[in-house]
From Swiss-Prot:
An individual GO BP term: negative regulation of DNA-templated transcription initiation
Span of domain SpoVT-AbrB: 5-51, 80-123
Keyword Cytoplasm: yes
Signal peptide coordinates: none
Protein name as annotated: Transcriptional regulator MraZ
Stored CDD domains: MraZ_C, MraZ_N
Gene name in the database record: mraZ
Compartmental location: Cytoplasm, Nucleoid
Amino acid sequence: MFRGGTPVSLDNKGRLAVPARYRETLISLCAGHLIVTADPSKCLLIYPQPVWEPIEQKLNSLSSFNPQTRSLQRLLVGNACDVEMDGVGRILVPPSLRAFAGLNKEVVLVGQGAKFELWDSEKWNLQMESALAFRDGIPQELEGFSL
């Protein structure tokens, strides 16, 4: 559904203009209602509301007695904010989430199938350098995978 990285700018109010190629899909899928939340990689995740709801339900159904699970619930659900595309296709990225991800004016919106990641441009470039160097190795489940 959503793929590719698109350099975009945040305006002085922290608004992001959603690239035109995604707007129609977002309007038909969720009437422009999106959820923005924090990601452990220090970027933001942006979900169409109907895609987010089962994720949130699953997270909330997990035991809060497991410290790792509770931390993830706090991070993802505790930071989740409802946002809505305005008439010209912009969303307001909440200040607390902009600070969390270290977002400045220049950002990259990265399609990840059913969701987006939003990265500060410099951090995104570092992520790509790391990925190209295979610093973390290739996951076992990808061994034998052919492109």
